[in-house]
Amino acid sequence: MKLKVFNVREEEATLAQDWANRNHVELSMSEGPLTLETVNEVEGFDGIANAQIGPLDDAIYPLLKEMGIKQIAQRSAGVDMYNLELAKQHGIIISNVPSYSPESIAEFTVTIALNLIRKVELIRANVREQNFSWTLPIRGRVLGNMTVAIIGTGRIGLATAKIFKGFGCRVIGYDIYHNPMADGILEYVNSVEEAVEKADLVSLHMPPTAENTHLFNLDMFKQFKKGAILMNMARGALVETKDLLEALDQGLLEGAGIDTYEFEGPYIPKNCQGQDISDKDFLRLINHPKVIYTPHAAYYTDEAVKNLVEGALNACVEVVETGTTTTRVN
């Protein structure tokens, strides 16, 4: 069996080769993305493992079909970069890695939340200026006294809820599907609006859909509890960034922890030091004094990277051997 792997980082290459040696599979790895210019590299292979960031060109699907490719295994949980229906029309199975390390994202969410609540960024900035005074702007709150709303109570949302619960928080949640594992961990409310009205901290853990794109806009932020904090470790399109910045400037929100930005594709994960960034909203976001921005790094742990690499490659093998996979999304 021969598999083609795109968008491979050095750390992934080592893990992928270890997997290949154990499973007696031939791998060809490329640092570059799957594009119209590179799609011919797939000729003669049985499957593709990919880490697509921006939208995959629609013209690629029929070309893959012509070459006999029947699947793309995405090395992430999110698959919004693929045209799932078009892929299906061309007989291409798209799979993901739905549960590579919920704890990684959950722990990171709570870490950033604590940094915001205890004003760590401001304290560190003061210390760099040799300002060691105790003043009102650096006074924090006790996390355990806060009500936390989890929007999206799947694997990651529930893992996050458990940690907040461990701090003593009251945890409420909203999801169109109630998770039976959430009993005793959080209380479900009837709407997103009800959740944000009650919460001191709102944490997003939902996949992007046409219905929830820019759900968190200025109208929604006006319904937030005064002084609340927003955490988005899910997908950038859930939040209308211009409105978030306005809500922060107006004092509707006290702060925001943002790990995903809707138009991050040109920048993440790249080293852009010394380069001009043309996206003014992105610049405002990453430099806003009330925002802790991180570059889609919430998942980034040893465990998660290993599980993503091996999960995608296992899905490739499963499709080749059985015609489908348990992690199929289309």
UniProtKB/Swiss-Prot annotation:
InterPro entries cross-referenced by the UniProt entry: D-isomer_2_OHA_DH_cat_dom, D-isomer_DH_CS, D-isomer_DH_CS1, D-isomer_DH_NAD-bd, NAD(P)-bd_dom_sf
Chemical reaction(s) catalysed: (R)-lactate + NAD(+) = pyruvate + NADH + H(+)
Any one GO molecular function term: NAD binding
Binding site for NAD(+): 155-156, 175, 206-207, 212, 233-235, 259
UniProt xrefs under CDD domains: LDH (cd12186)
NCBIfam families (alphabetical): PRK08605.1
Protein name (database record): D-lactate dehydrogenase
Name of the gene: ldhD
